Amino acid sequence: MQAHELSGAPWHHPVFWVAVAFVLFFVLFGRKIWGALTSKLDSYADEVRQNLDEARKLRREAEAMLEDARRRKEQALAEAKRLLESAHAEAARAAQALSDDAEASIRRREKMANDRIAAAEKAAVDEVRFAAADIASRAAKDILAREFGPYADAALIDSAISKLPQALRAA
């Protein structure tokens, strides 16, 4: 502003009247505005306090839930470790049982194979004996047929019958 505008009575200037209106406005409505403003700020502060209380409560609940989750995690890890150890032990027992079963099966099969071999050997020996006995009996028959005639058979039978009582006494 310029100096010539400020000269004269203060009520002749618009700045004076704006200041008066401003003061008058605050005198008339200041208490209502101040009351409304403070009540609004108080309600906002109460709301903030409630939100903070709720946040603290939620934080405590979250911490409790976190602690519970950690405890359950530790329990689950312990349970998993126990189950894993149990599974390892069970697997070792199963492997040992399978090994024992396989060993027993091998022994049974070996015994069966040995039994089959022994049976085959016995059958072969019996067959050879039978064949040898058959060959010997045929050879004896041929020799007897060549050496002795039809009359010699009767003499042999008579001789065998006469020796029979001695053989029975000796036995």
Swiss-Prot record:
<keyword id="KW-0406">Ion transport</keyword>
<dbReference type="GO" id="GO:0045259">
    <property type="term" value="C:proton-transporting ATP synthase complex"/>
</dbReference>
<keyword id="KW-0375">Hydrogen ion transport</keyword>
<dbReference type="Pfam" id="PF00430">
    <property type="entry name" value="ATP-synt_B"/>
</dbReference>
<protein>
    <recommendedName>
        <fullName>ATP synthase subunit b 2</fullName>
    </recommendedName>
</protein>
<keyword id="KW-1003">Cell membrane</keyword>
<keyword id="KW-1133">Transmembrane helix</keyword>
<keyword id="KW-0066">ATP synthesis</keyword>
<keyword id="KW-0812">Transmembrane</keyword>
<dbReference type="InterPro" id="IPR050059">
    <property type="entry name" value="ATP_synthase_B_chain"/>
</dbReference>
<comment type="function">
    <text>F(1)F(0) ATP synthase produces ATP from ADP in the presence of a proton or sodium gradient. F-type ATPases consist of two structural domains, F(1) containing the extramembraneous catalytic core and F(0) containing the membrane proton channel, linked together by a central stalk and a peripheral stalk. During catalysis, ATP synthesis in the catalytic domain of F(1) is coupled via a rotary mechanism of the central stalk subunits to proton translocation.</text>
</comment>
<dbReference type="GO" id="GO:0005886">
    <property type="term" value="C:plasma membrane"/>
</dbReference>
<comment type="subunit">
    <text>F-type ATPases have 2 components, F(1) - the catalytic core - and F(0) - the membrane proton channel. F(1) has five subunits: alpha(3), beta(3), gamma(1), delta(1), epsilon(1). F(0) has three main subunits: a(1), b(2) and c(10-14). The alpha and beta chains form an alternating ring which encloses part of the gamma chain. F(1) is attached to F(0) by a central stalk formed by the gamma and epsilon chains, while a peripheral stalk is formed by the delta and b chains.</text>
</comment>
<feature type="transmembrane region" description="Helical">
    <location>
        <begin position="9"/>
        <end position="29"/>
    </location>
</feature>
<dbReference type="GO" id="GO:0046961">
    <property type="term" value="F:proton-transporting ATPase activity, rotational mechanism"/>
</dbReference>
<keyword id="KW-0472">Membrane</keyword>
<comment type="function">
    <text>Component of the F(0) channel, it forms part of the peripheral stalk, linking F(1) to F(0).</text>
</comment>
<comment type="similarity">
    <text>Belongs to the ATPase B chain family.</text>
</comment>
<dbReference type="GO" id="GO:0046933">
    <property type="term" value="F:proton-transporting ATP synthase activity, rotational mechanism"/>
</dbReference>
<dbReference type="InterPro" id="IPR002146">
    <property type="entry name" value="ATP_synth_b/b'su_bac/chlpt"/>
</dbReference>
<keyword id="KW-0813">Transport</keyword>
<keyword id="KW-0138">CF(0)</keyword>
<keyword id="KW-0997">Cell inner membrane</keyword>
